Amino acid sequence: MCQRFGIDVSHWQGDFNFANAKNNEGVEFAIIKAGGGDDGLYKDSRFEDNYRKCVECGLPKGAYFYGNAKSVADAKKEAEYFISILSGKKYEYPVFYDVEGKMITDNDRATLTEIVKAFCEIMESAGYWVGIYSSESFFNSEMNDGELTRYSHWVARWGKSKPT
């Protein structure tokens, strides 16, 4: 398997220097936080600037949305909102549904799987290359991952100093 070195960036990183990351740190792509649903529906305050900086330095990019859906109806609202943020922009990497936190604790396995599928189906029908971000243990124990294999997987391995 070919490994590439990428980063995820949100407002938490502040005024991030993508050109330096690409030219001096070996970063090959960035996945930018577009928004989330964990505090009402919102757009990440740095999204537009982060997107622009990636374009300016030629860094390939994708985007992600931090989910908080408690039902299929919520997931559909989150997907439509995500589409509104992404509209008019180009992505070389998938757009991801970030599945962690309260989505895991507030939903049973079958419900969470249906929520994730609903979100991804809407994104895919809008023409996006869609993926799911979660930890390996969440993919294995909190979702019916066999029903989600058609979507790209970005597997979190928190606490590692280097990708494995």
PLM region descriptions:
Residues 11-15, 35-41, 67-72, 101-104, ...:
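Solvent-exposed loop/turn segments at secondary-structure junctions
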Residues 16-26, 46-59, 82-91:
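Acidic (Asp/Glu)-rich catalytic clusters
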Residues 1-35:
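Boundary/entry segment of secreted carbohydrate-active catalytic domains
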Residues 24-27, 80-95, 102-164:
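Surface-exposed substrate-engagement region within the catalytic domains
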Residues 7, 21-22, 54, 97, ...:
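Conserved, mostly hydrophobic/aromatic
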Residues 57-73, 89-106:
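Metal-dependent polysaccharide deacetylase catalytic core of the NodB/CE4 family, i.e.
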Residues 43-46, 69-83:
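Glycine-rich anion/phosphate-binding loops
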Residues 5-9, 28-32, 61-65, 95-97, ...:
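Hydrophobic faces of well-ordered beta-strands that scaffold small-molecule active sites
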